């Protein structure tokens, strides 16, 4: 399958992306609705989840991505592999995130990962970054107690901002005393993670437990 060419960054504040995510019928998506759920926000081409769904078939995976051509491509690959524990959905998680979150199978959201999000370096573009306080509040409401939030970026200032926003909410407890978590908690690295290491550059990670 030919690789889809898309813009690396899209403005999540533009009118095109200012609509709530339309949840599918999850009963038509997942073969076993009783399995715990891992939500990956900003999944890009979905390669991380396509591998994770095969490595951990006892978990359901959901990838959210704002670039629709990548979602179409990822779902085509999911179908080709016959994965019934994985779905990719197009949308902006910072527009009424509760609509999607409340539609998910109840008491199943155990993992949330946000990995290498678009940094939007300029301060005037800070509202375009994915980890906004409203998203943190919504995740706190719908995640299962004892669940996990995993964050990583190759931009230290962005990793710090994400970490501080989760740390500011009483439902999320940071799990390490060191400034950054050394190892990825998942058995599969993202494409950006591999690229960063190949360049000899650091990755900044944080891990939170849900109260």
From Swiss-Prot:
Catalytic activity: guanosine(46) in tRNA + S-adenosyl-L-methionine = N(7)-methylguanosine(46) in tRNA + S-adenosyl-L-homocysteine
Keyword vocabulary terms for this entry: Methyltransferase, S-adenosyl-L-methionine, Transferase, tRNA processing
Positions of substrate binding: 122, 154
Pathway the protein acts in: tRNA modification; N(7)-methylguanine-tRNA biosynthesis
InterPro entries: SAM-dependent_MTases_sf, tRNA_(Gua-N-7)_MeTrfase_Trmb, tRNA_methyltr_TrmB_bact
PANTHER family tied to this protein: 3-DEOXY-D-MANNO-OCTULOSONIC-ACID TRANSFERASE/TRNA GUANINE-N 7 - -METHYLTRANSFERASE (PTHR23417), TRNA (GUANINE-N(7)-)-METHYLTRANSFERASE (PTHR23417:SF21)
Protein name as annotated: tRNA (guanine-N(7)-)-methyltransferase
Originating organism: Microcystis aeruginosa (strain NIES-843 / IAM M-2473)
């Amino acid at each position: 399958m030919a690789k889809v060419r898309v813009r690396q960054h899209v403005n999540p504040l533009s009118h095109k992306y200012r609509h709530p995510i339309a949840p599918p019928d999850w009963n038509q998506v997942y073969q076993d609705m009783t399995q715990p759920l891992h939500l990956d926000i900003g999944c890009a081409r979905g390669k991380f989840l396509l591998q994770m769904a095969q490595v951990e078939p006892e978990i359901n995976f959901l990838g959210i991505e704002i670039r629709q051509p990548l979602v179409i491509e990822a779902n085509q690959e999911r179908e080709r592999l016959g994965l019934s524990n994985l779905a990719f959905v197009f949308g902006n998680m910072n527009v009424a995130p509760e609509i999607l979150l409340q539609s998910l199978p109840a008491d199943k959201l155990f993992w949330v990962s946000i990995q290498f999000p678009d940094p939007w370096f300029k301060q005037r573009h800070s509202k375009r970054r994915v980890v906004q306080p409203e998203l943190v509040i919504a995740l706190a409401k719908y995640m299962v107690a004892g669940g996990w939030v995993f964050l990583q970026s190759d931009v230290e200032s962005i990793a710090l901002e994400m970490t501080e926003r989760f740390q500011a909410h009483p439902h999320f407890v940071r799990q390490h005393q060191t400034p950054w978590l050394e190892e990825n908690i998942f058995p599969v690295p993202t494409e950006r993670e591999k690229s960063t290491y190949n360049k000899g550059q650091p990755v900044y990670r944080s891990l939170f437990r849900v109260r």
